[in-house]
């Protein structure tokens, strides 16, 4: 006797064989004239299977290990997960940029004239490079023990971030196209706007970091001690997530500069 499950299976088999000639055995790939032909959707799917899944598994195992053997593991592992997820989000946008810029049709930047000044972009890049150097110094001082000058370094990094936000806003005000002007304008505003929001979050983290350091010095809490007449503060390991997040923002900007501003 035919049951409902058997009837459903027979119907599916009937539709499969009736449309056998119309079934495609491959995914739609890029045109052969583009440089993305070697990484078409078929091979990209295989790449996801052998790259993303093992990475997610390694992160999962690492989080379990850190939850048992590390004191501040939950916050650090959570921050690493956030950074990795944001990196994957930016990768999807960069993939879209490559897709439309290397495809022969439609034109990627039809009717778009980039009006950003080269000096403005170089200034923005120089500011973030300076912030990266200061962040490296901050990381070194955290590992060795923080002196009284560390609060000034954090404040300088915060000021550099404010300068970046001001220059980015100036660029937006002088652009000659909008977000709905072709796919180029859409991707430009989406990617740079998303990065701008990450910079704002990084500035908030730096501001909180600076306030915590000042309060620790003012209250002379148990975090501070003196050695050979020099005052130090030992901060918990969780404060390094701010530095890690700021480095991530700087690296993303280098990719943005390459995709949008390089010739």
Swiss-Prot record:
Location of the protein in the cell: Mitochondrion inner membrane
Pfam families: COX3
InterPro entries: Cyt_c/ubiquinol_Oxase_su3, Cyt_c_oxidase-like_su3, Cyt_c_oxidase_su3-like_sf, Cyt_c_oxidase_su3_a-hlx
Membrane topology per record: Multi-pass membrane protein
Electron transport in keyword set: no
Keyword Magnesium: no
Highest taxon of source: Eukaryota
GO cellular component, one term: mitochondrial inner membrane
Molecular functions (GO terms): cytochrome-c oxidase activity
Segments passing through the bilayer: 7-27, 44-64, 78-98, 120-140, 145-165, 191-211, 241-261
Gene3D superfamilies xrefs: Cytochrome c oxidase, subunit III, four-helix bundle
Catalytic activity: 4 Fe(II)-[cytochrome c] + O2 + 8 H(+)(in) = 4 Fe(III)-[cytochrome c] + 2 H2O + 4 H(+)(out)
Enzyme Commission numbers on file: 7.1.1.9
Name of the top EC class for this enzyme: translocase
Alphabetical UniProt keywords: Membrane, Mitochondrion, Mitochondrion inner membrane, Translocase, Transmembrane, Transmembrane helix
Swiss-Prot/TrEMBL GO biological process terms: mitochondrial electron transport, cytochrome c to oxygen
Assembly with partners or alone: Component of the cytochrome c oxidase (complex IV, CIV), a multisubunit enzyme composed of a catalytic core of 3 subunits and several supernumerary subunits. The complex exists as a monomer or a dimer and forms supercomplexes (SCs) in the inner mitochondrial membrane with ubiquinol-cytochrome c oxidoreductase (cytochrome b-c1 complex, complex III, CIII).
Protein role: Component of the cytochrome c oxidase, the last enzyme in the mitochondrial electron transport chain which drives oxidative phosphorylation. The respiratory chain contains 3 multisubunit complexes succinate dehydrogenase (complex II, CII), ubiquinol-cytochrome c oxidoreductase (cytochrome b-c1 complex, complex III, CIII) and cytochrome c oxidase (complex IV, CIV), that cooperate to transfer electrons derived from NADH and succinate to molecular oxygen, creating an electrochemical gradient over the inner membrane that drives transmembrane transport and the ATP synthase.
Family: Belongs to the cytochrome c oxidase subunit 3 family.
Protein name as it appears in the record: Cytochrome c oxidase subunit 3
Species name: Plasmodium vivax
Taxonomic classification: Eukaryota, Sar, Alveolata, Apicomplexa, Aconoidasida
Name of the gene: COIII
